[in-house]
């Protein structure tokens, strides 16, 4: 395979790739800078072992973290967490929010009951198939049916409908008003127990659903007024998928936590200083969120190389 063309070994045919491995491959297949002998040697070197990156720090990881934090993460987000898998990136964003909200409510004892805390999310969302995320995903029954889930508040998704000429085909202000009314109802029902509002800034699996900046700003306002964290799930849209490093930058409406994956190869979250409003948050309390491998060095090396390619070829311009 090469560039945007997939090669089928059985038929010896090439196919235009509109799949990109579930939107996880950002620069095409076998890019020359990925085949460079020096890079290939580095890749083979780190692939020979799989250290526990959360506890064993290597030069390769340090170089990657510096590159990602300075070349991909926008200013104002000093905290990072690395893991394998987009669903687990979202999962740990939720855990960070639950911990933050519990401490905001004065529940600092780790034995405290927090089962009343919930996550507000949208209809037609896809946030993964792991434990917490399964309660948020609601695209098709195939992916969530027969698995026990939490009954967390789910509200209308006010998506833009376009006519054939690109104009608005629906009363989007009315759709947003409906969503906001349902959000108000959810906050009234759950009082001060909504830990976070989570949204994909563009719903992919849910149907290529786009939202206006006005709605994202409304979510920002609710999160600020009701002491909830605003989480943007950019696992599918992030890392220049929209032309900018992160889709939310088109609207200049910053969340508190961003979950990323797919095109970044290694997955994870970056988080703003709002998390530091509570002491002993998950970035300060050792081991509160963790995994054995903390991502993969091979994925980190590949992600760093993608940053080189994107910058060298001006793909973000």
Regions found by a protein language model. Give the residues of each.
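Conserved N-terminal phosphate-binding loop of PLP-dependent enzymes in the Aspartate aminotransferase
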Residues: 1-317
């Amino acid at each position: 395979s090469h560039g945007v063309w997939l090669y089928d070994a059985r038929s010896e045919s090439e196919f235009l790739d509109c799949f990109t491995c579930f939107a996880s491959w950002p620069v095409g297949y076998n890019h020359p800078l990925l085949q460079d002998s020096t890079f290939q040697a580095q890749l083979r070197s780190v692939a020979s072992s799989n250290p526990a990156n959360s506890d064993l720090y290597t030069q390769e990881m340090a170089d990657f973290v510096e590159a990602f934090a300075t070349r991909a993460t926008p200013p104002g987000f000093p905290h990072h967490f690395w893991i394998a898998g987009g669903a687990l990136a979202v999962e740990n964003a939720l855990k960070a929010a639950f911990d933050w909200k519990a401490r905001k409510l004065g529940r600092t004892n780790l034995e405290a009951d927090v089962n009343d805390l919930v996550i507000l999310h949208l209809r037609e969302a896809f946030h993964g198939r792991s434990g917490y995320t399964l309660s948020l995903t609601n695209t098709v029954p195939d992916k969530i049916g027969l698995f026990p889930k939490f009954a967390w508040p789910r509200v209308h998704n006010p998506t833009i409908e376009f006519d054939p000429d690109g104009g608005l085909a629906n009363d989007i202000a009315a759709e947003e008003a409906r969503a906001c009314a349902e959000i108000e109802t959810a906050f009234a029902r759950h009082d001060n127990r909504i830990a976070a509002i989570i949204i994909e800034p563009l719903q992919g699996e849910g149907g290529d659903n786009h939202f206006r900046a006005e709605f994202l700003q409304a979510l920002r306002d609710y999160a600020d007024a009701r002491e909830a964290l605003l989480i943007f799930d950019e696992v599918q849209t992030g890392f220049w998928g929209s032309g900018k490093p992160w889709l939310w930058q088109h609207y200049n409406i910053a969340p508190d936590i961003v979950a990323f994956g797919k095109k970044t190869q290694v997955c994870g979250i970056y988080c703003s200083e709002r998390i530091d409003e509570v002491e002993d948050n998950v970035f300060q309390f050792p081991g509160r969120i963790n995994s054995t491998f903390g991502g993969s060095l091979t994925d980190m090396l590949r992600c760093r190389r993608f940053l080189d390619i994107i910058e060298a070829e001006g793909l973000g311009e």
